[in-house]
């Protein structure tokens, strides 16, 4: 039973037959009653605790209302925040995919370019290393390689164009990397803000008494309404206890006033009473006004037995008043602890809300101010790479065409060597036929000459000289002439470098390595080793092509 209940029960239990009634034979002195009055007045200082209880209830109710609002706002922001974070990381993934895909394609194209350029350089080196045989060139000319017949300006211009495309792509890639790095810095800042958010949530989970708090992003508000109800109950009980103390004080005042010489003492003691207090919607009567009314009210006649009963109740209640004061102090201590718990939960919710607001503001700033730039940079790189990719592919095709052209030049030179060898072989066959034919014609000529001379000797004296003018002539002679060939059908025109000359006699001395222009056509005389090397290279190319 509470102290207030005990104090009230004591008032009801007192009566003429109670033990206190047995003490009625010896009425207390005025000093004793005054001491009880002073103690009762001192106990009324508990009104400060009741005031504080009222403040606690008001603060707790305000904290609960604020917590509900904060929790609702935080929940709304968290849902939007989660969606924005998913969208943000999706955008970052897409931007990174653009960078990786472009980098991979660029690396692949560069590898193909390096391969094509290395192949072209190798072909050009082969042209430099291949010296045109001196028999193909005018006498006295400095040695020349096949590379001397190639105009490399086209190659250099193509390489310059490719370098420009590569530099522009590298510049766009560097700008995208810088943009992505800034994007990552933004994400790192958001992660730090999220770290603060998680710390606040972790603190809320660790301080929550709910069994599922550790798995919840936000602390539950379910414990706060019961705590507020507990505070209201404490405040109400404290008001009731204070009211019982006031009643005890009024009883002391009445007893003192009914004691001879006590009126002045009562007015002196009750001259500085505290004001009234309102707790949980109900008001404690104005103490000062009540005491003033009690002091100034005329004394009702009181029998000795009634007076004795009043004194007995006063003495019994005086013994319990200290317990009532202690209970009020205990309750205010509990209320302070409960309020601290409520405010702590409110502060945790507020810290989560502030952390959420921080992340949300950061995301909003990023989305409106900087994110469009990061996305635009990715689009810019895609556009630049698309343009330069087409140019580089075109340049790659041109490099391949040039390499095919120069490689064809090498192959054609080897073919030229074999063609010269073939023509010389044909010339040799022609010369052989010519020699054999001339030898037979010479034989026929000698036989004809001898036969004509024999006829002249044997029959000439009998034939008149004018019978046939040709009877004394030698046989006709046949002479071979070398005539330069014309231009092959479809071949480009060129200036002839030899005049039609009569054929040399078989016994005439032969010319040097190359036939002279007197023979109608110049066919270089190539070493056998040169022809064999050219044939070997052509066969090797044919094997590679298969």
From Swiss-Prot:
Bilayer disposition of the protein: Peripheral membrane protein
One GO location term (cellular component): Atg1/ULK1 kinase complex
Pfam families, per the entry: ATG17_like
Residue ranges, annotated region (Disordered): 1-26, 204-225, 487-527
Coiled coil ranges: 312-341, 424-447
Biased composition (Low complexity): 1-22, 496-506
One GO BP: piecemeal microautophagy of the nucleus
Keyword rRNA processing among record annotations: no
Localisation: Cytoplasm; Preautophagosomal structure membrane
Residue stretches spanning the membrane: none
Keywords for the protein's UniProt record, in alphabetical order: Autophagy, Coiled coil, Cytoplasm, Membrane
Family, as annotated: Belongs to the ATG17 family.
Task of the protein: Autophagy-specific protein that functions in response to autophagy-inducing signals as a scaffold to recruit other ATG proteins to organize pre-autophagosomal structure (PAS) formation. Modulates the timing and magnitude of the autophagy response, such as the size of the sequestering vesicles. Plays particularly a role in pexophagy and nucleophagy.
Protein name per its UniProtKB record: Autophagy-related protein 17
